[in-house]
Amino acid sequence: MSRLATKNILITGGNSGIGPAPAQEFDREGARVAVKLDHVTRTYRRDEFEVRALDDISLTIPTQGFVAIMGPSGSGKTTLLNLVAGIDHATSGSVMVGEEEITTMNERELAAWRARHIGLVFQFYNLLPVLTAFENVELPLLLTHLSKAERKTHVESALQAVGLADRMDHYPRQLSGGQEQRVAIARAIVTDPTILVADEPTGDLDAKSAEDILLLLTQLNRQFHKTIVMVTHDPRSERFVDTVYRLDKGVFIGSEKGGMSDHTTGLVAPAE
């Protein structure tokens, strides 16, 4: 796998230093598939009642795509995202990432897989206040076999990629909300994950900072070829993604092309 030509950037869009990326299949349009959900249902028990958070979901997400999962509160967006990230388990059906069936993995296997392939970004940044931006971004690498010098190179590359090369020694209290989210994104990409999973990444930001973060995610997708799956309520997000997936009451109701797509926008019914 070739590295990007950008100076000092080691992020490749494919899991360069943590383990081999999985082989991938192709969808009906010839695009490589990053994620495939096949008749996935997720139910929970609440007292004597069964709650169906996701109901027979089938969809694919293309490799190097930037997709938004949207719908009203309680529609199952975060549940779907948690299944893709290997944080939760499907009650039935199959979740494939590349050619790896993650629904059959035990907790130990799933944790190891998640560390290799998934970068997580949340609405709240979850930065440790006693650590600098550099030290916060370095945290995931402390669990790897990289040397201190190698970790330094990866951290500097990640912070440069999010536009914070000059803020490495700053503590969270010295950063704006948008800058804190950039640190959180750098922490998510520092291991060069296969997929970046973002849950309401602009939900705690003002309008300008939110748009800056969406532009950054677009850059990571376009320049560094990251597959990005984002849950959001923010209608502005539709301008920045390739495809919007719509959920309602746990049901996948269709998809439409986003503003970054080269195709005409229009509702597309889910595949049978």
Question: Each predicted region: which residue ranges?
Answer:
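Conserved glycine-rich cofactor-binding loop
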Residues: N15
